[in-house]
From Swiss-Prot:
Protein name: External core antigen
Sequence repeats: 184-190, 191-198, 199-206
Propeptide segments, given as residue ranges: 184-212
The organism's place on the tree of life at top rank: Viruses
Segments for region (Disordered): 172-212
Amino acid sequence: MQLFHLCLIISCSCPTVQASKLCLGWLLGMDIDPYKEFGATVELLSFLPSDFFPSVRDLLDTASALYREALESPEHCSPNHTALRQAILCWGELMTLASWVGNNLEDPASREQVVNYVNTNMGLKIRQLLWFHISCLTFGRETVLEYLVSFGVWIRTPPAYRPPNAPILSTLPETAVVRRRGRSPRRRTPSPRRRRSQSPRRRRSQSPASQC
């Protein structure tokens, strides 16, 4: 919590730890979920185990390889691009802060505690954010949401009643446990045949080329 208070001191311009605690109370009173505007929730992401998410380094390399031009562009590409930019910048600032704290702590045990806290707690949140937005850009938001729902249903189903393998994002919708209901195409109901009039009519002569 000391590191978190230090973050709040910097971000909230609070000069003391006591002031940062007030800022912390204000933040905890707000219901902010970074996934809400994208149709997901923190709880939905929490169904995925922590070892599911690649390392931050791998995720950053993936984002750079696939979307570097768009991320560095001054143009607004999509909400996912914007959120991905913010997550990358946040991780960079967090690494800078953690390095500064580690270099200024004389106690080796305290330095180790700071590193473990950043990697275990904050690192997991950043990995979740990076994975979510990279996946949305790669596979589409609807596919990612369908995957999260399917995985959540799969992981909460007793092993005896669920498929042996978890859903795989890259193979949806084939491996989806629950599929979203889509609009089924309208079926045209056959119209009742009209009765032909009993009066004789002259039939049109059809050429062979006009027949289907």
